Structures are given as C-alpha cells and as structure tokens.
Design a protein with these regions (language model features):
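Membrane-embedded alpha-helical bundles of multi-pass transporters/translocases
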Residues: 1-524
C-alpha cells in the first residue's frame, strides 16, 4: 500500500488525540466516584447506578458506532470528510459536554444525563480515532511509533489529570467542588485543540488501495434494507470474537486495564480514609505514578520491538502487582506515614501501569492485519467499537463493583471518619483485587505470539493474497505458512475469505480445525 510520508508532526498530532481517551478517563477513574459521594450527596449505590446505565447504553452505541464508521464512506458526508474523520470533526465542539459532569450539588438525574451525554460523545470520537493507524500505514515499526506517540501523549494527559485537581483544591479550598469543574474545563479545551490537530495531520486509506473483497462488501452494503443492516451488524460484531488472536488481545487488555480501574477507583479512598491524608496527597501520588508511566511508555517502544509485546507485558504486570501489594503491606507494617516510601511505591506502580497502557494499544493496530488475512477485508471500525465498549464497560464495571462493596462495608457519604471495616475493605480491594485481575492478563499473555517477526511474515503473505485475490499455500514456504496459521488460527488455504467469518463470507463453509504441525523457529513463537 502506498502511503503518504509520515513525519514527526503526524505521530505527535495523532497521539495528541488520546488526550480525550486517556485524560478524561484518568480524571474520571480517579476522582468521579469520590466527587459524587463527597460533593454531590450521592451514595455509592446511586453513583454506581449511573455507571450501570451508561454501560447499557454502551452495549448499543459502541458497536453501532464501529459499524457506522466502517460503512459511512458511501454517504456524501463520508466522501467529503472521510468515513472516520467526519466524526472526529463533529466531536470537536461536543467535548465541552465533559465539564457539565463536574458541577457540584445537582441532583441524581442531572448527573445521570450528563454522564450519558459525554459517554456518547466519547464513543463517537474514540471509535473512528482508533481506526486511523491501520488506515495510514501497514508497517509494523511505523505502527509501533504511532502507538508510542499515542500512549506518550496519553500519559502526559494522565499527569495533568493527576496533579490538576490537587492544585486546584489547594488554591480554592479542599471542600470546593469548583476545583473539579475547572479541571474538567481545562481538559475540554485541550481535547478540542488536540482533536483539531488530529483532523489536520491524519488521513484515511485511499479507496484504490482497498482489496477486491472490501470493494465488493462496500457495494453490497448499499443495497441492504434496515433489517439486513442490523443482521449484518450482529454477524460482524460476533465474528470478531471468533478470531483467536483478538480474544487473546482482549484478555491482556482487560486484565491490565480492569486492574488499573479497580486500583484507581479505590486509591483516593485509601489516601483519605486509610492514611487519613488530604485528597491533595492522593493527587500528588497519582501524579508521581503518571510521570513514571510516561517514562515507561518511552521505554516500552524499543522493548516491544526487541522482545515482543507479550514478554514486555508480563514484566510490567509483575511491577504493578508488587506495588499494589506493597501499599497494603506498608499499612500493616506501620510504615504508611513514611511519605518517601509511598512515593517510591507510586513510582514503581507508574512504571508498571505505563507499560500495561502501552502494550494492548500497540498490539491492537495489528489485529486488523490478521483479520484482513482471514476475511480479505479491512474492518478496523468493528474492532475499535468492541475495544471501546470493553474499555468503558470495564472501567464502569470496576467502579460499580468498588462502590457496591464500599457501601456494603459500611461507608457513609460525606463522613470524614469511617468505620474500621471500611479501611480493611479498601486495602483488600487495592491489593488483592488488583492482583487477581492482573493474574488473568498474565496467563492469557503466555499464548500471545504476535511480534515484529511474525507480523513481518503475515504482512508479506497478506500482500501476496491481495495480488492473487485468494490464499494459495503452495506458493509460500512451510515456515511462513505455519506462522500465518499460528496467528490466524485456521489452515492457510481457508484464509482470504475462504471461511464463514464476517457477513460477506457468512454462506461459506467454516474453516476446519487447525492441525498443529512441527515446531517453529523460537524467534517466531516466543511470547
């Protein structure tokens, strides 16, 4: 595929778009439950009802958005502004809805409405945004650089999200809800600016670079009725979970991110109600983590290229798991008032969290390449929709669970001194809860085999299939065939649409089970 020249401005502008994804998520995950229960008069159960309602909405909106952005290219607006970039342009003024969530002393229905509104805006922007890298390049190293730029900018936004509330609380007073409103307003302005840069410095895959199968699918879409379109949506969404490497990717992604969501949801409570410190201290510790997350992301770029995503992922999971356990050990050892130790543990946690943030979004950009080899189509939007749905569902689910457990443990909203059982519950969630989820991601990563070498083989074989219009195992080496089969999870001759994965291929016979062959070179199979 011919691509435009990619320079530093393109990497940085694309990465800046995740100020919306990571910055607002960091602020929401670390502070929203605390804001609702401290400044808005909501009980933990009421707050979790808001998150639950948003997830019901997400179950429809996120996959629908992925489907829409994949198919928007046939419309006048899609042809004029791009099937992906139109929604980014539309979202620029809409990001200011984020600030409406952070107005204090309003009622339950106000907070429900504002949360749902921003949730839809977030989805409308993030789903097409996440598809842009595979639209712009097929190259593994360029994709890695795009991912590195994205996560680096994301960590910069997380640093701001961590420190800003504490600074504003110090200026405006620790009991002033306006601190959070002004913090959200800063993020709204920044997100609008960053999305403008994304619009100006990114592009979509030219139509002449589409495969024959993709063009055929595009033509078929224009003749579908509403019922047929909905049926197609269901088939396309469910087909993503039939791709083995995507299931493995989701396992690593959710293992790392849900662990962070659990940790984030309870960390401010840990500082305020277990350590008996001001919320500004929590802000400083979260800021320390965010700084080291940024450092970790920079280090992960060469590590993932050198050792592969899965081994790098396991290393940072161990770092974050040990630091989570250390917070509880400090308390029970009577050392929790030693601020230097808290800073040290937070720094180690930041190194682990930064790596966990980087690896899944780095590997995500290659999943559509595996899918193209299987289906003969480019379906980035569908995968982005599923990713956004699982991300937001995991965040809200973690916060919901924490809120319910806190309520059951005897937590009282607005009360500065909590029952002793609440402290032990907070410590249990912070350490054991985080470790259990991390362990799930660690185990899944043992089976993940996508790396620089296997992707290079996949890419060369995909180019061959594009030229031929079908998969022919006789024209490839035994080792290359084994690598592609390992990633795709089906026999080579069943690739490039010769299976029933996806709507376009739904009437074809299913691919037979893959028979394991001889051992591959360890360079290809390490994971």
């Amino acid at each position: 595929m011919k691509t435009r020249k990619i320079g530093l401005a393109n990497y940085l502008a694309y990465g800046a778009g995740d100020f919306l994804g990571a910055g607002t998520t960091a602020l929401t995950a670390a502070w929203l439950l605390y804001f609702y229960t401290t400044f808005c008069g909501l009980t933990p159960i009421e707050a979790t009802l808001i998150f639950a309602a948003a997830r019901v909405l997400d179950a429809v909106v996120s996959p629908l958005m992925g489907f829409l952005t994949d198919n928007f290219g046939t419309t006048w607006l899609g042809k004029r502004f791009g099937r992906r970039k139109f929604f980014i342009l539309l979202g620029i003024p809409c990001v200011f809805s984020y600030s409406a969530m952070w107005v204090g002393e309003m009622g339950f229905w106000y907070y429900l409405a504002t949360y749902l509104l921003f949730d839809m805006v977030y989805t409308m922007i993030l789903v097409p945004y996440e598809t842009l890298v595979p639209e712009m390049t097929d190259d593994f190293k360029q994709k890695t650089k795009f991912s590195g730029a994205r996560i680096s900018m994301a960590q910069m936004s997380a640093i701001l999200a961590s420190f800003l509330p504490g600074i504003l609380l110090s200026w405006l007073g620790k009991d002033n809800a306006s601190s959070f409103f002004y913090a959200s307003l800063v993020f709204s302005v920044l997100c609008a600016v960053m999305l403008t840069l994304v619009w100006c410095f990114t592009w979509e895959r030219p139509r002449e670079a589409w495969s024959e199968a993709a063009l055929r699918a595009e033509a078929e879409k224009q003749n579908l009725t509403l019922d047929q379109s909905l049926n197609r949506l269901v088939i396309e969404l469910s087909s993503t979970l039939r791709i083995k490497i995507f299931r493995q990717h989701l396992g690593m992604y959710l293992g790392g991110y849900i662990a962070q969501d659990v940790f984030n949801a309870v960390f401010t409570y840990y500082v305020v109600f277990v350590l008996m410190q001001e919320a500004a201290v929590a802000s400083n510790l979260l800021g320390t983590m965010a700084i080291f997350q940024f450092i970790a992301v920079i280090a992960m770029i060469p590590l993932c290229i050198r050792f592969g995503p899965a081994p790098s992922y396991r290393m940072v999971v161990v770092l974050f798991g040990l630091s989570s356990l250390s917070y509880a050990l400090l308390y029970y050892a009577g050392l929790s008032d030693v601020y230097s130790l808290l800073l040290l543990i937070s720094a180690v946690a930041g190194l682990g969290r930064g790596g966990i943030n980087y690896v899944p979004w780095n590997t995500y950009t290659y999943i559509a390449d595996v899918d193209e080899a299987i289906t003969g189509q480019r379906r980035e939007g569908i995968f982005a929709g599923i990713m956004t749905l699982t991300r937001k569902a995991s965040q809200a689910g973690a916060v919901m669970l924490v809120g319910i457990i806190m309520q059951l443990s005897g937590f009282v909203s607005g009360q500065k001194i909590q029952p002793e059982g609440v402290s032990h519950t907070i410590l249990l969630i912070l350490s054991v809860g985080t470790l259990v989820v991390l362990a799930c991601g660690f185990l899944v990563s043992l089976r993940f085999k996508l790396n620089l070498h296997t992707h290079s083989v996949l890419r060369s074989e995909t180019l061959r299939m594009r030229e031929l219009g079908y998969a022919q195992s006789e024209q490839t080496s035994a080792e290359h065939r084994a690598v592609v089969e390992l990633l795709a999870g089906m026999p080579y001759d069943c690739l490039w649409g010769n299976n029933n994965i996806g709507y376009l291929n739904r009437h074809k016979p299913a691919a037979p089970a893959l028979i394991k062959g001889g051992a591959l070179n360890s360079t290809y199979t390490r994971g």
